[in-house]
């Protein structure tokens, strides 16, 4: 019988002190994979119940045995491996779903804290937009709170501004408009929040596909089928201006919601895309990303209005996402079913050096969302009806959700960066369903 090969391993972590094991090297079987290593950490920490852990060697997630990792990286079995352990991300389970009258085109769950992180009962609000033109508000159990006719022809995008700007929400639609809304609490004890139109932004000549606020929330960008990428002034100061106008009786004409509305002030027109600009992300105050049907992803210097970097691919870019902690990195989904990552610190435009293919779906990748509390985790959604969770340090998905019965069109995380955690997802699609997923172990 062959003698069992062992490897010296030193376990390290950035977790709090009560989750740290001694860094003294220990000998472990070389055929151990993630599960076996997780058992060792749980044993050393005497955790009850046990917790799942993931492991990294030189920044790469371990998905093979230690022996296979040594061979793949041409490392000696005599050397001591430094292995970092982190909490494993466990795919969530569907908690609730609720029907819409039409396709669900966009969702935002950043103002909703799931039950697992709020003492047993969900709190906050989830917003959704759909092809019937309605903006809907839901509580943490996906019970209807309010709805308002927001856009003629359908809502394309719904996005909260950062909390520093108060309870302000942006929507865009097929009617060429962008609108800003104020969420306010009802005076009735059992009633939920309501929506009031604050401002209407006109400047696009075709449907507005997406909006994204700057980190401060004082500006936002919009993009659409007219090939335009526009930067606007917005935020709390505009809400205040609208309120002042109402108080002084100098009202502008409003649309379909009650209350007075200001006319949004336009800013820069960032020119460069040759076709529909499908998506926009704004990770740093002076730097934003856009993606379009001209197969390109562009990083813009907002101050100069010029494209700082451009990646030219071979297929239409349908969605993009970024993270404030890694503003040089952008994830984007394409019509060739691939999810890609572009590190703009690499050689711009070089597929070999700057862009990596994270993974693939069975259909167009229509939505991607970066976890607000982790720069390593993203989720993607596709026309194949699935949602996949990824750690960008490996090309193997962490898990897949397949509850939708038709194309998934919208995706977001529950809880924002301000909450310091994200323990769930919310999604919508062509099956006219809004779905919520929760887990005890996602990212915190």
From Swiss-Prot:
Residues 91-123, 243-264 are annotated as: Disordered. One of its GO terms (biological process) is maturation of LSU-rRNA from tricistronic rRNA transcript (SSU-rRNA, 5.8S rRNA, LSU-rRNA). GO terms for cellular component: nucleolus; nucleoplasm; preribosome, large subunit precursor. It is found in: Nucleus, Nucleolus; Nucleus, Nucleoplasm. One of its GO terms (molecular function) is ribonucleoprotein complex binding. SMART domains: WD40. Required for maturation of ribosomal RNAs and formation of the large ribosomal subunit. Belongs to the WD repeat WDR12/YTM1 family. This is Ribosome biogenesis protein WDR12 homolog. It comes from Chlamydomonas reinhardtii.
